[in-house]
Amino acid sequence: MAYYNNPANLQYYDYSYTADNSFNTQSRAAGFYDEPLHEPLSQGWLAAFSTSGYPGEPSLLEELEINFGHIKQKTTHVLNPFKHVDVHIMDDTDMAGPILFCLLFSTFLSLHGRSHFGYIYGIALLGSLSLHFVLRLMSAKNLFFTRTVSVLGYSLLPLVVIAFFKNIFTFNGIAGYALAALACIWCTYAASAMFVGILQVNNMRFLVAYPIALFYGVFAVITVFSK
């Protein structure tokens, strides 16, 4: 007990570092937190319309999974359906292109007469579900519904062009019917080529194309006879 009560034992505790080192530690810590970790963002209500962000932050288009390069590649393939189909062309099942083409198709038809947004979206949804179910029965490969919608949406482009020109020319004759039928065949050929490449069913091209032709045939009829 005498040993612990002896004040001389306190000489073994060195307090010489506390004054200077604590000051240096606190100053370094303060300097660390004072340094900005990133560039300051713009302030005010205009900041909501700016494109500034944190360094390394993905852009808004990347977060929305919108890639204009992929949209251009798939659109080019639809415009040139005789081109060799890459089996990985639809690995990124973006929905920006199909939604854009569907909106354009509905808008062009509404400019000519009554609005057909409800009919077009209903037929597109029901037809996509039916085709997805049929195509999954034809192949053992896994086919996602978003990929089916993406292929069908991109392949709608020829009929979108027909709907645009209907606002300029009349399609109430043999020439108009022939152009609509040609666009339907074009859509069917492009979509069936991509589905055959994705599902690897080269010997079932006609079976794949038949239900797709019925799907685009409905849109062709709406395009020709809409008033």
Swiss-Prot record:
Gene Ontology CC annotation, any one: Golgi membrane
GO molecular function terms listed in the Swiss-Prot or TrEMBL record: small GTPase binding
Pfam families listed in its UniProt record: Yip1 (PF04893)
Cystine connections: none
Major subcellular site: endoplasmic reticulum
Subcellular localization(s) per the UniProt record: Endoplasmic reticulum membrane; Golgi apparatus membrane
Assembly, per entry: Component of the YIP1-YIF1 complex, composed of at least yif1, yip1 and yos1. The complex interacts with the ER to Golgi SNAREs bos1 and sec22. Interacts with the prenylated form of the Rab GTPases ypt1 and ypt3.
Family: Belongs to the YIP1 family.
Protein name, UniProt field: Protein transport protein yip1
